[in-house]
């Protein structure tokens, strides 16, 4: 199937019980918790709680729903697609006004999204996109440009190639800690990074494996890389948590993270920024999890039948060590 993530120009802008393998909650935010009073009811199917980024994202959504007076029905899929599909079907049966979700993986959503469409329930993709030829199955996408995030990470390495050849052999050997297999950020960040580093033939990815966006996963994969690969110069982790796990593995091997092995990550959550300020991470590309206010605004508009952009991309920045130290005192997540 041809990948279609929405062709429109990006616009930047600053229940029924589930099975035992998932969980859900009703975080009613309306004046009396009754959607019959004219307030909007949103069903939100979250990926899980696999990282600091995801926890901040969930809090932003819950807090923003309360502030907007939106009745929020929330489910945690624990990183399993089947749990998200069950949650979405539950929301359809409950006749919520709008469904939002962050897809665990890109593919396999057409059937359940067609069910939502037949029920006249609009869908908002949040944080992650889906791979579908039928873009009528959702109203809009809200989140980051993951390809650009990967490109920013790779461009920093190209720009700092001279300092990144740690072993001095003339080649820059990179190991990559990938996110969840099949997930949009893992696919797109990897593609963006590969595109950027192709400008310098000295840079190559010598090993790449999923750490599933978790700290433990990053640590385990990095331990394996340190045993199987010689002369690692750089780690590119698809999120901060895997990078923090890699730091633990590097230290356990008697090496100094940020010096003996350079580390580039994506997210810019507090733990990652703290490691960056301490010099254990060398560069972080921001991925803003605070999508709640924009999500509630979009939900109100689509329920009212208003036109919304097909793609809403958040504005984000990058951080080096000095910038991280400056930003940390006021960091929200």
Q: What do the predicted segments below correspond to?
A:
Residues 2-8, 20-333:
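A residue-level marker of the well-folded mature domains of exported/periplasmic proteins
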Residues 11-12:
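Repetitive helical segments and hydrophobic/amphipathic motifs
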Residues 15-18:
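Bacterial Sec-type N-terminal signal peptides, specifically the leucine/valine-rich hydrophobic h-region
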